Amino acid sequence: MNNNIEMIDLSNINQNTNADSNNVEAQKTNPSNPNNISILEMYGENLSRKEYVTNPAIGRDSEIEQAIVILLTPEKSALLVGKAGVGKTAIVEGIGYRMKNGMIPNALKPYELIKVNISSLLGETKVGEGQSENRLQLLVDELKTKKNIILFIDEVHLLVNRNTTNMSIDFANMLKPGLDRGDIKMIGATTYEEYEAYILRDRAFLRRFLKVDLAETDEDQCKKILLGTYPKYEKRTGVKLEYTDYLKEKIFRFIVQMTDEYKRIYEIGNRYPDVALTIVMSAFSLASYENSPVVTMKHFYKAICRTKVVYEDAKIKEIARFKELFKDILAEENVDLNDM
């Protein structure tokens, strides 16, 4: 033991002592977190380190740039507002994609973009609002301490809608001081309905944000999204889409036009590009289920047939159009749609 003492580098003693003092001081300043629990690690997903197969926000450069400019604005955070299914989360992932690939301004390069599931964070706290308040306070303290985190909260209206969480705590008030000082940078996302019902009523919370309106993508944008997204489904399922570029574009255009023409009779809440992406994803899943190495017209046909619509007549019309438009390739693949 004495030998070990003689081998100690005395030059490190002061450093070690200082480190120990800092740890003690940290525990003194935050007695509610003696075990140094990281809420960001427990409930967060790091979107700036995520492995992206493709750019998740194709055709949304303008909205992404708007959000980034807001994040560069002192003491302001970004609020994405749009209908359900327009791709709010995809836009935030698009920012994460840019961060991962160094495609952002230098001022944001030290930052990490972390998505926190606020519903899980609050939903699990059934023992009482004291535990909820403690978790939120730990999150706020962690954000203030690290200072290089951009927090993304989907359904950000939950922070001000206390009726949803059945709590009497105003969680938004816990964030306001940090947002005011610029200690906390944030991206929130919500729908127009929730924005008008809850966010607009809390003017003090709202003034910390600048709004980015997300319009529904048009037909051309949606087709580009499908063309840019299908490689992700190839990787996930191990199934390939091996048609020519011309035929791929023709298939995706049909799907986009179908969802455009009948989007008003699809189940409420589905919008571009949500329905179209679901159909393409379903085609890949069906091929994987059948252990097929490739996606065929049969799989697209089945996916279209299984799409939920309110009026069955609309689906019948679209199926007839599909059969006519792709009759040559259906014949080439020897697909008998009458057997399905």
Task: Indicate residue ranges for each PLM-predicted region.
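AAA+ P-loop NTPase nucleotide-binding core of proteostasis motors
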Residues: 2-340
